[in-house]
Each structure stands twice: as structure tokens, then as C-alpha cells.
Amino acid sequence: MQHSDTLITHVDHRRLRSLLDQDSPTEQENVAALRQRLRGARVVSPSRIPRNVVTMNSQVVLRNLDSGDRMTCTLAYPSEARASRRHVAVTRPLGTAMLGKRVGQIIRWPGGARERRLRIQSVPYQPEAAGAMNL
């Protein structure tokens, strides 16, 4: 079954499938969720992905719906994720929740003792919109 609200470029889909096929022990707790996200996503050409969709290496502004706090982060591959640069690995629960979602959508992910609810406020940088189709 496809999740109509999840769009992924064929480049991201291929790279993420390859990453999951490596069966690395890192981030194992969320691998099943990421596999499910990939299975249900609608896969499109990088040139056809809307500018408001979170793709790999996108910079994303999120608003916490409970506290009102805003945070900016970049969705990254695990090997490229650096906390000091506010990168979120796609293999982490927040990263998987953001992947393929659009501006305005609410994402939910486990955070501490309770579920967190974040709204995607904007995508200031998306590689595909910037012409970087293979990032």
C-alpha cells in the first residue's frame, strides 16, 4: 500500500534501499520503520519532486506544537550526520518521520516519555529545487 502523503525521489529511494541492505547495526531500532516508509512511498523523478517536500539533504524548519519552539535541521545519511551541524540521520525516528513529508504536515515521533508533534514549517533548502539532483 502506498502512503499518498509520502514522496521520495528515485535517487533517495535507491540510496536508502542500498543503505538498509548493508544491514549495519547502527540505528537498528528504526530500520523497520524506515523500510515501511520506503515501501509505502510514491517514488518520483528528482525533477518532479515539489519544492515543499523534505528530501535527503534538505534543510527543514520544524515547530513543536506543544511548546511552540522552532528548530532547524538537515535530513542526512547516517555517515554524514553531525549533531554539531544540526543534522538528523534518516535512520533516527525524527529523520524517518520527516522523509517525504510536505510543508504544513504534522509529523509524530517518539520523544522521551511521550510522542512529540512537530509541524514542518518550511524547507529553506532542498537539493532538487537548487538543481543538485544527485545529492
Map each language-model feature to its residues.
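Generic detector of short, locally flexible boundary/turn motifs and exposed helical patches
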Residues: 22-29, 37-40, 71-75, 82-87, ...
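Intrinsic-disorder/low-complexity coil detector
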Residues: 24, 49, 109, 123-126
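Peptidyl-prolyl cis-trans isomerase
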Residues: 48-59, 128
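Short peripheral tails and domain-boundary helices/loops at the edges of structured domains
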Residues: 123-135
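Non-DNA-binding regulatory cores of transcription-related proteins
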Residues: 56-61, 66-117, 124
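Weak global preference for isoleucine
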Residues: 8, 49, 106-107, 120
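N-terminal intrinsically disordered, low-complexity, charge/repeat-rich segments that act as generic
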Residues: 1-51
